[in-house]
Amino acid sequence: MERVMEDIKPAYKELHAFIRKELHEKYGGSVVNPRGPIPDHLFQQVREQAWQANSVIEPYFPKANLPPYDSFVAHYDAKDMINAAENFYQSLGFDGLDKEFYEKQLKEQDQSAENGDCRADIFDLTPHVYMKYCKKVEFRKFLQVHGYLGRLHYAKEKQNLPSYFFNSYDLEYPVGEAIILSASTPKHLQAIGLSKNFEFSDQILMNRLFRMGIHTMLNIPLYFVHTKVMTDLLNGTVEIERINKHYWELMVKYAGVEPPSDRPESAIDFPYNFYLDMEENHQTKKFVSEVLGYHFYRSFCEETHHKGYLHNCDFYGNMEIGNSLKSMMSLGSSKPWNETLVRVLGTNPSLSGDALLAYYTPMLDWLKAKNRESKVKIGWNSSQKKIL
C-alpha cells in the first residue's frame, strides 16, 4: 500500500494543487492557504460533489455537458438492469445464473429496509449466494449491479473446492471494479444501444474522466490513512491517547488535508467509515479493490489489443478474458495470493499505482498544463492548526 501511495504522489499533488487553487479563489486566503493543506470540510465537499453541478471543475467541464446517463436506463426496471449486467458476464463465457437463483436466491428489498443509497445486499454462502436487490433505477445502480454480479459468479466458479478454500482474498471486488470500468465506457454504451443517439466528444470524455478521477484519487489516500491508523494502533506504533493527533499527522502527510480548526486533546475526529474497518477491514478492501481493479482492467484491455486512451476500452464479448477470470476464480484460496493473480495479471503481479495513472493520463496531462499556466505551488507546507 505504501508503494501505491508513493507511485501516485506526483499525480495526486497536481490534483491537490488544482483543487486548492479553485477553493482559494472561491473562499479566500483566510479559509484556504494557497500553499498549505486543504481544510478537511472543504476536501470532503469536493469529494462528495465530484458528480454535481457545483464541483470545482464546473467552470472547465460543466455538469450540463455530461451525457444524460440516467435517461439511458430510464426504460429499464431493476430486473432489466440485472439482466443487462448478466449479459455482460455471459458475453465473457460465464454460465448464466440458473432458474433456482432467480426463483429462490434473488429477492427484492423491502421498501422499509432500503437504505438511503439503496445498495443491494449480497450474502455469500458458497456454493449458494443470495442477493436482495434495490428497485431504484438510475445509471449508478446499473453500474453497481455489474459489480455485484462479479461476486455471484466468483462464488459459482469456486463452489467445487473444499469449503476451507472458499476464501477468495476479496478478489471479487476488483473483478467487479474492472467490469464496471468497461461497462461504463461510451464505447460499451453505444455497442449495447443505450446511448446510440448521443455523440461523445473529446470534451465530454474529459468531463467524465475528470469527475471519475476526483472521486477515485481523493478517496485512495483516505482509505490508506484509515488503514494505517488502525494498523499503527494495533501494533503499538501509537498509543491510544495520541490517536487523534496521529490521524491528523497522517492526513496532512498523505492527503494534504488539515482539520478546519484547532483540535482539543479530547477530540476524536475519525469519520464514520473509519469505524467500518474495525471488523471487516472495509477501508483496506476499498483501497486494494480500487487499485487492483485498474490493474485487471488494463490487463484485459491489453489482451484485446485496445488502441488509444485506456478510459474508453470495452472488453465486452472477449471469451479469452472470461477464461482468465474463471481460471483465477476457480482457485479460491487454494493457491497463494500472488499465484492466484498470475492467472489474470501474468508474471510477478504486485500492487502499484501505474495502471491507475495510465487510466487517468489525459486528466493528469491537463492538470499539469493548467497548474503551470496558473503558477500554483505543487505540494503543501505543514499545517498551522494546533492538534493536542
Positions of PLM-derived features:
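C-terminal, non-catalytic "cap/extension" segments appended to globular domains
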Residues: 45-63, 75-80, 84-87, 111-112, ...
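Acidic/polar loop patches that form or flank catalytic/metal-binding clefts of enzymes
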Residues: 90-101, 160-165, 185-195, 240-244, ...
